[in-house]
Curated annotation (Swiss-Prot), chain A:
This is Small ribosomal subunit protein uS3m. Belongs to the universal ribosomal protein uS3 family. The gene is mrps-24. GO terms for molecular function: structural constituent of ribosome. Keywords: Mitochondrion, Ribonucleoprotein, Ribosomal protein, Transit peptide. It is found in: Mitochondrion. Its main location: mitochondrion. The lineage of its organism: Eukaryota, Metazoa, Ecdysozoa, Nematoda, Chromadorea. GO terms for cellular component: mitochondrial small ribosomal subunit. GO terms for biological process: mitochondrial translation. Residues 1-23 form a transit peptide. It comes from the Eukaryota. The keyword Repressor does not apply. The keyword Mitochondrion applies. Component of the mitochondrial ribosome small subunit (28S) which comprises a 12S rRNA and about 30 distinct proteins.
């Protein structure tokens, strides 16, 4: 009995504690700089809800169509493998950290498109060799022909849509 | 899309000051010079000398050389870029070199390919801008949106024409009989086979739905007698469409399309031969067992003929119209009657029934 009275007293002194909202939604939000030096590509500048309206997808295949979902998880895993390989294999030539690599699938062919830059070092023979190696390696790994159709730009500024 | 950049600034960099001092920092304050020079003027909390460790590198640092260059103290040889040869051999964009009027585009872009801004001589732009009048949409070079979308630059009208010319030798002319008379298709080609091939991306080209085969047979072309036809229709059940006169056989129980096709042909053969068989119990067939209500042998026919004969015998009742009540008009009425009895009753059909009946009996319309 006594304990319960104490309990009630303790309850009466309690209050609902409130804190400010934690606005954790960070997708598509870019932080601007005071001197407008932060580079934004078109892909970055458009918000996630603009996908399919203002910007299109970074992966093109038929496995996400109705009645064609036969190996969708495989496709997602393959995409990640390809993206990581390209990021790791062309570290000197990446544009915006290799976040914008387009993967297209046509028939049994996997096509990797996007942009690379040569501002640091232009070694044409080396690039040809690396393209050949990447194509061959990914073809063996994924058991299907892989084509690299990546275009070179002078520097990262060439893909800049805006500076904020 | 989000990219983190760590920009660290050294707020208290002593190195820069030391460099400035080394180059010609005579105008700096004395105290600063002492500190920068690594003097022993600074005491630590124990009162001992704080000897700052600073090892000047033997080579001149970048800032030092830049300052010396700027002030003209020394002359430095300007060296060309180490990748100069590669940069010189770099080709200018092909779109600038090419003459779009003279060259064949099919040779430049023969097959499906990702958009390449250096090759396509079109002044295209893609992307949105909040205010297009102020700033034009994103340019062709380095435009990822143009790279993403599938293009049809390999399917220009001349390219399609070229392809058609190339495969023309494999084509046979369309049958002229069918061109002149399209309705004769079912007569010349009584069996049509439908199947679907599914093309989609993936390492496997198999699709289980491609095994389904639909076979459509124009039953009238089987040249069966009336009894045989009725038996075939009864065996085919709901596979026979009365309106079009076509029987549809859909086979999907085998694994491959070829097997299903063979099975469909087998089913057709079996149906055909089964329909031709005459069993003992076929003779037991009654009028009520027929698929359709027949005019011949019906109560209506007997009553009608009886009525017509009575009318002929009656002297006062002479048929007004010529030829009413003869065999031809009875047959005509019979056809109408059969259609009326074997289909859904509508207002028009009932009116037609009345009209025919009046005509048969010679009553004024």
């Amino acid at each position: 009995m006594l304990r319960s009275i104490q309990h009630v007293e303790a309850l009466s002194s309690r209050q609902i504690s409130t804190t400010s909202m934690l606005l954790k939604n960070r997708a598509g939000k870019t932080k601007s700089t005071s001197n407008r030096t932060q580079l934004l590509t078109y892909e970055m500048a458009q918000k996630p809800h603009h996908i399919g309206v203002r910007k299109s997808w970074l992966t093109w295949h038929s496995q996400n169509l109705e009645e064609f979902r036969q190996s969708q998880p495989l496709v997602v895993a393959q995409d990640e493998v390809v993206r990581r390989f390209i990021r790791g294999f062309f570290p000197q030539n990446l544009v915006v950290s290799g976040n914008e690599i387009v993967i297209k699938r046509r028939g049994n062919v996997l096509i990797v498109a996007g942009f690379l830059q040569y501002s640091r070092r232009l070694d044409i023979r080396r690039i040809y060799w690396m393209f050949g190696f990447a194509e061959e390696f990914l073809s063996i790994l994924l058991k299907q022909p892989v084509k690299l159709e990546m275009a070179f730009v002078e520097s990262e500024e060439d893909v800049a849509y805006n500076y904020i | 899309m989000h990219r983190l950049t760590h920009v660290s600034t050294r707020n208290r960099s002593s190195l820069a000051e030391k460099l400035r001092n080394a180059v010609g920092g005579q105008d700096f304050g004395k105290a600063k010079q002492i500190v920068a020079g690594g003097s022993i003027a600074v005491k630590d909390e124990h009162g001992e000398d704080f000897r700052e460790l600073y090892v000047m590198p033997k080579r001149k640092l970048r800032g030092q050389t830049q300052l010396e260059q700027a002030t003209g103290r020394t002359e430095y040889k300007t060296r060309s870029r180490f990748d100069l040869m590669d940069r010189l051999t770099k080709r200018p964009p092909r779109s600038e070199e090419m003459d779009p009027e003279a060259q064949k585009w099919c040779d430049v872009w023969p097959a499906a390919r990702t958009f390449a801004s250096s090759v396509v001589p079109l002044p295209v732009r893609m992307g949105t801008r909040p205010n297009v009048e102020k700033r034009a949409p994103f340019k062709k070079e380095g435009n990822l949106e143009l790279v993403k979308i599938p293009n049809f630059l390999h399917l220009t009208p001349p390219a399609i024409q070229q392809h058609c010319q190339a495969i023309k030798k494999f084509c046979t002319p369309f049958p002229p009989e069918l061109l002149s008379n399209p309705s004769a298709t079912c007569q010349h080609l009584p069996i049509s086979i439908e199947y679907s091939t599914y093309i989609h991306q993936g390492t496997s080209i198999r699709d289980i739905r491609s095994r389904v085969v639909t076979m459509k047979i124009h039953v009238a072309e089987l040249k069966l007698s009336e009894n045989q036809m009725e038996k075939l229709i009864r065996l085919a059940a709901n596979r026979y469409d009365e309106k079009t006169g076509k029987m549809t056989i859909i086979t999907d129980r085998c694994h491959t399309r070829q097997q299903n096709l063979d099975y469909a042909h087998y089913l057709l053969t079996v149906l055909y031969h089964e329909a031709q068989k005459v069993e003992k119990w076929d003779e037991l067939k009654n009028r009520t067992d027929a698929l359709k209500v027949e005019f011949d042998g019906s109560n209506t026919k007997t009553k009608l003929i009886d009525l017509l004969e009575k009318a002929k015998l009656t002297p006062g009742l002479s048929p007004s119209a010529a030829g009413c009540g003869d065999q031809k008009s009875i047959d005509e009425f019979g056809e109408m009657w059969k259609a009326y009895r074997n289909s859904e009753e509508t207002v028009e059909k009932t009116r037609e029934y009345g009209r025919q009946m009046k005509k048969l009996l010679g009553i004024q319309q």
